[in-house]
């Protein structure tokens, strides 16, 4: 996809985010270009994401960052994992309207997907504003290949969440590589991307039953 087509695809996404079908608030629509899309694009500063051949976007929702990454990385294969049917419908429409040939909607829980075709096949997993770090790491681990990476978009750093993740890391076969401060848009403060790497085979206990990673995250004991 040429640069012009990439920009055209993102313009279509902005248009779609302004429709009633979009799973995003009206306030978020007004901030979509300057905040949400800019924030999504910031992940491309991380080389491991740019180099990934197969990427999963966890809890894709409105496709931020998944649709943005798909538009900017046309050679990569992107699976948008989302369990809510209305959001899946939006993502499917967006893929068609944006002309993305490299993106697919996986309309099921990530835990279920990780028990089948999604197990240990992704070079990178992206997740933006979907939960606690330990929860995100647990959901990502069974999807990632050994050595694959998780990029978790977060706001201000939380000592509590980072300690919880530290206690859970060995159990999840995940290790923290970097916590990178980001400034994706004017006036942005306290934005971070947490970069984690899978450091072994998926533990046998993963994935747990759907919902358990959020309800009782490892490391919270």
Model-derived segments and spans:
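Bulky hydrophobic/aromatic packing residues
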Residues: 2, 33-38, 55, 69, ...
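Conserved SAM-binding loop of SAM-dependent methyltransferases across substrates and taxa
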Residues: 62-75
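Conserved glycine-centered beta->alpha loop in an early N-terminal alpha/beta scaffold
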Residues: 59
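Short amphipathic alpha-helical segments, especially helix-boundary/capping motifs
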Residues: 14-21, 69, 139-144
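Class I SAM-dependent transferase core
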Residues: 1-56, 86-103
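S-adenosylmethionine
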Residues: 73-79, 83-221
């Amino acid at each position: 996809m040429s640069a012009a087509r990439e920009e055209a695809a993102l313009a279509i996404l902005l248009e779609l985010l302004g429709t009633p079908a979009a799973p995003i608030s009206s306030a978020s629509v007004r901030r979509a270009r300057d905040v949400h899309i800019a924030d999504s694009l910031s992940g491309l500063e991380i080389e491991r994401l740019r180099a990934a051949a197969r990427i999963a976007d966890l809890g894709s929702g409105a496709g931020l960052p998944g649709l943005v990454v798909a538009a900017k990385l046309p050679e990569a294969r992107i699976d948008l994992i989302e369990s809510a049917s209305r959001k899946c419908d939006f993502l499917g429409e967006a893929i068609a309207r944006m002309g993305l040939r490299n993106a697919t909607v996986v309309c099921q829980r990530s835990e279920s997907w990780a028990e089948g075709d999604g197990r240990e096949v992704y070079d990178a997993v992206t997740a933006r504003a979907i939960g606690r770090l330990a929860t995100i790491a647990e959901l990502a681990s069974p999807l990632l290949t050994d050595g694959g990476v998780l990029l978790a978009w977060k706001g201000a750093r939380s000592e509590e969440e980072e300690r919880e993740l530290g206690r859970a890391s060995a159990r999840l076969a995940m290790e923290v590589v970097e916590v990178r401060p980001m400034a994706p848009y004017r006036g942005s403060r306290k934005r971070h991307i947490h970069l984690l790497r899978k450091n072994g085979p998926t533990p046998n206990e993963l994935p747990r039953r759907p919902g358990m990673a959020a309800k009782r995250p490892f490391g919270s004991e």
